[in-house]
Amino acid sequence: PRNLQGATAAIDSAGMCRFVAFAVLDQPETCQALNDLLNAFYGWTHTGDDVTALGKRVLKMEREFNAKAGFTKEQDRLPRFFSADKVRPHDITFQVTDAELDQVFNW
């Protein structure tokens, strides 16, 4: 999930609709085609690793902005229903602790 979020942040910050992320990230050749498109449009010479790094930088900047705006990690939590309401047909809940969530962005 965190790699998907980073890749989606990179795609979104490059001016592409974030919904293309799902199609692009499922196929290596499509991902390469998008990278080629962005390189051609912006005059970049980015590799796939550069795009990954861009996504990480964007997410880091977003989190820094939120911290400066006064948001704390206690406010960066999923709604209670994620861990309380069972999802059918498997009757399971989201079983990730707050401590694990706090580590998601520690690259």
Where does each model-flagged region fall?
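Extended C-terminal regions of large enzymes
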Residues: P1-W107
